[in-house]
Amino acid sequence: MKRLFLLILIIIIGVSGLSAKDYYIYCTAESEDEVALIRFDGKTAHVEKRIPVGVWPVEIEGPHGITVSPDGDYWYLSMAHGIPFGYLYKYKTGTDEMVDRVELGLFPATMQISNATGLLYIVNFNLHGGHDEISTVSIVDPDEMIEIDRVETGVMPHGSRLLNNGLKHYSVAMMSGKLYEIDAMTMELKRTLSTAPKLMKMDDHSGHNMKQGKMDKMDHKMPPEKPTWVYPHPNDKLLYVVNNGTDNVVEIDIKKWSIVRTFKTDKGPYNCEVSRDGKYLVVTYKGAAKTGVWDLKTGKEVAKLNNSRKVTHGVVISPDSRYAFVSVEGIGKEPGAVEVIDLHNFKKVAVAEIGKQAGGLSFWKMEN
């Protein structure tokens, strides 16, 4: 019996050792001009490094969006506060040394690199512009750090994401209330869609790019939805759009180009992400200082967790679908934080404090 107990104990220890992983995440601190590299070992979140970013020592340049290249060799950072234009920065992972930068539009924000084209697509949010100023998506060669095109979309575009196959790019425009589809290969705007659960106007669901700018400029009435984020399902058949202004997330069938489900959320939903196994949608509630977890099969919210401070921001989920990493800005001089949620038991398991106004996150790697 004693030998059997020891054998079972050895097996348990061995299995737990094999399953232990280190998860590495980059997170911006917008009011600190820093990027934090965080390592989560399954129990504790460690701030491995605080990386100063930008080139102006006495000015806050505002690191906002961040993404890691598909090969994991570089990370890219949008610096929102330009004079007047912002920049895209390129850094080497590991050493975290700056490689290059390129000037873009007004307040560059969210970005992602296409698996199909290898190009980087980044929205120019134009936070301080007028509510009728049409902005753009910049398309950048991340190897040469050259902007090769700009595609006009709507007013205050945000939430730049691509299908997993890299062939289609999606973004939303906060003050236009619309979703935009760009062909990643041809760099052309193909379709637009109102993010309102009930389609009210003919032009809301029409899919032509030729008159898009004129149509948006003529519609001075701001839609109440104020969409802030879009994220594709791993099957590349569905999209999830966060309507910050009307407290809901809409599920969109890409082929039908229509809304098929609406999830009523807590106050001020802001970002979202779908786990790679397709089971869960994690939504940050900026206005409620909470994070929600939705079961996509049932359409029900299965967990809602209070965050450690106010102003919940972004979320990224580990590739093994085990953990959600949530950034929480904090208020004033309060440090920002990255919180770790276990998607097996829906509990918060770790918190790492970083610089002020924690914002964009990007997953780097997992190591055994």
Q: At which residue positions do the language-model features occur?
A:
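Predominantly soluble domains enriched in secretory-pathway, periplasmic, or organellar proteins
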Residues: 15-368
